[in-house]
Amino acid sequence: MELPKDFLHEIESLLGSDEANALCHALTETEVPTSVRINPLKHPSALPPTESEVPWCETGMYLKERPKFTYDPMFHAGCYYVQEAASMFIEQAYRTITTDFVPQRLLDLCAAPGGKSTLWRSLLPTGTLLVANEPIRQRAQVLAENLTKWGQPDVVCTSAYPEEFAPLGSFFDVIATDVPCSGEGMFRKDEGAVNEWSIQAVDACAARQWDIVQSVWPALREGGYLV
């Protein structure tokens, strides 16, 4: 797979040759093992065969091979969630920002299909509130279904645009914003993502990200964290 020249130039200027080459290798040649995250409240009696633990997530596991999850009742019961290990890294962000305080209200602004929301809810202490939001109504339905299967309490699922949270005024201790990105992580999965990449697309995503963050910013309390 040949990566866009503008992309190669950008990452080399930002990272240097060694790290840029390692990133290119990861995006084009490295096979990604299937990983799952265990639901700490359900303790499944049986899991697909595991290979090793995900180092940055206490409940994350790599599988030896990818099974047909649709045939596994444990999957449908919400005993585990299939999620790329990279997405589990938000656990490290949570542990970093909670060294000096315990968040009482967390907003996951762009939450569908629900992988990160289920992890946020597993990390938050009992009695705290998670608001899992997805602006697109159809995707919000998938989000609600996955949160229901996960089965943990103190979750509100909403379908609102970022600016609709602003009137709450300093309500949330943490706002997690998985804002739209230019999709370099999809290169290994979809060659179409390589063809669609451009500097213009990156700039457009950056502008959209800024608009989203500005819109929701008033809902974050002073001293809170935007992730």
Cite the ranges covered by each PLM segment.
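S-adenosylmethionine
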Residues: M1-V227
